[in-house]
Amino acid sequence: MLLNRRHFSLAAGAAATLGGFGIARAQDTPLVLGQSAAFTGPAAQLGIQFHQGAKLFLDQYNAQPGRRNVVIKNLDDGYEPDRCAANTQKLIEEDVFALFGYIGTPTSLAALPLAVKDKVPFVAPFTGAMSLREPFQKNVFHLRASYNDETALMVKQLTHLGLKKIAVFYQNDAYGKAGLDGVTLALGEQQLKPVALATVERNSADVAQAVKTIVAARPDAVVQVGAYKACAAFIREARKAGYGGTFFNMSFVGTQALADELGKDAAGVMVTQVMPSPYNQANALAREFTEAVRKVNGASANFSSLEGYLAAKVLVEGLRKAPGKPTRDSLIAGLESIDRQQFGGFEVSFSARNHVGSKFVELSMLTGDGRVRT
């Protein structure tokens, strides 16, 4: 299905988010969710879009009478681990109820020890790194599938098409290495290895040497594990250098942001998705989401904002199911009781020993006129 890609207005920025959940108001004091994410810099669109999706859901809940408010306190980390760690320490010292919607692997890894130490729920980070999932942590809940799930699907598709010479362009940090590990694992199961490797530094778009290295290897396809600005720069420069192969990107790249950066050069670029398409009106979650979007002046939809919307919806369901008054422990218990539950046709399932809610992954393809094919 080919559908128009829609965008969240940037005008909303990263303002505090108010919302509520479906239990009787116990007190007037809101529950505070702390979020450290990129709201400036080369990864800013990811933080902005996720936050706006969460805001969309929580605001519509807050409009209902008798609901206790939930406030998201945002702090900008610019997608830098040190800033994220400092933000997280500040949020914990301010006694936030939970940490929610962190953006990225290196930043989430910087925050995780602090969250674990103080037993603060860490819910729905925007990352699929295995290093955040293993070993199991009682207070950490992942909504999305892992990067290993994404790279397994990429390699399966590529090898099915007879494309076996695969190069990897990756960010030189924990995120990039998590993606590289996933590609290497999936290729190894096919008795294959990457034909070339090249890196880019986090928050940089200096890709000249990486393009030279990878184009020289003449791969059939390039798997990209980076943020949207660097990946877009690599695609443009590789094509200028004469490369005619296929580019595969992981979901973290940000589908809308990558397409915006590339314009007509987006044609044929592949992106794995861990959320259902927000543009497919046959999907009940997409219909609910886009109906909510239509009610907000100037708002529109994308994959990252849908993930924020669903993450807030799942967290609220955990609060609804929480035994007794809302506490950190009762939120954990409430989330663990979400067992094979449908959220508009998207299944989320947690348990006492499983805190990964979904394994859903599918492929999408960008077009040169701003659309997404799923």
What are these regions (language model features)?
Residues 1, 22-37:
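C-terminal segment of N-terminal export signals and the immediately downstream linker at the start
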Residues 7-26:
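N-terminal export signals
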Residues 34-53, 75-82, 103-106, 169-177, ...:
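Extracytoplasmic "Venus flytrap"
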Residues 46-52, 60-131, 143, 200-207, ...:
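Beta-alpha junction/loop-to-helix N-cap segments that form part of ligand/metal-binding clefts
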Residues 86, 129-131, 138-242, 277-291:
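Extracellular/periplasmic Venus flytrap/periplasmic-binding protein
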Residues 91, 95-103, 123-125, 167-169, ...:
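Periplasmic-binding protein-like
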Residues 235-308, 370-373:
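Extracellular/periplasmic periplasmic-binding protein-like sensory domains
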Residues 295-305, 316-372:
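Segments of small-molecule ligand-sensing domains
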